[in-house]
Amino acid sequence: TYDSMIKTLEKSVDQGFDFVMLHNLFLMEGVELNRDEFRNKYRMKTMYRLLGSNYTKIDGEFIAEYEEVLVENKFFDFNDYLSIRALNLLFFSVFQGDLYKFFFRFLKDIGMPLVSFFESFMSPNPEHEWPEGYLRFVKDFKEAARNELYSSLDEMYSDAKEIYERNNDVGEPVRLNLYYYSRLMYSEKDWLNQVLRQHLIMENDKIDKNALRIADNILDICENLIIDLRQPCNNRILETEFDFEGWKQSKYREPLHNFRDGKRAINFSMRDSQMEKIRSFCEQNSNLNDRDFGFVAVETILPRSDLFYEIVYE
């Protein structure tokens, strides 16, 4: 069920795993669950989606790769599927993409359930006034999560073929995790800190002023850790009382307050190899608009740790 899955995810986070990933079940030819016996037993309903942008013409014949995705069964409905899909995005962004990693580790450190926070982030309370850009981001993702699904293979192939022939190329990215992760990294920075802070307060209305002050410091650092790929030099100097690199090296197994070592200035640097990788990427992709530029960056600059500065303590 959806609730049992949430409990398993929370338990995995609490156990301190370095990576926690969430994937929707898809069925393949030959697997046991794809037999009629099990489809009927569990009342499975499936739909189809393109596998990335893997469609093209070869010798005049249009071909496309796809997944057959489970969207309903006797234990959960389509709305549960969409909620899982939204959680999938945030688990990918944080655990594989290192998005605001210190902030989300801090939430765990102060006892806030991470999965509940993710659920709230992707389902903003309509009674609260939120930034327009944030609401648009959530709306865009949920619409894209619906629109990536097709009732039949014929419908999927027809749509992909029409897009390919119209553009003489693939269309908008259908790898939703990467695309919306790239938006959080580069296109949505004007509201991200404000929204994360507000959700922190709403999820824990008894949070004390000191914890909120630390959260503000961490949010500021996390925002500045993301390299502006078009202008990669960050000359900002911030202050903090914590050794975040030491906390990271401990794999976050100790509480953050164990790494309090007095107020110090920090700046942000890149390794030579990292600078060269980014320079080369920019030369090859300078013609792209900002959103495509960000998407291609998170898709091709690997490891993704190279998308972030390193903290240097003065």
Tell where the protein language model's regions lie, with residue ranges:
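C-terminal non-catalytic alpha-helical accessory regions
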Residues: 79-190
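Generic detection of long, well-ordered alpha-helical segments
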Residues: 2, 74-81, 131, 182, ...
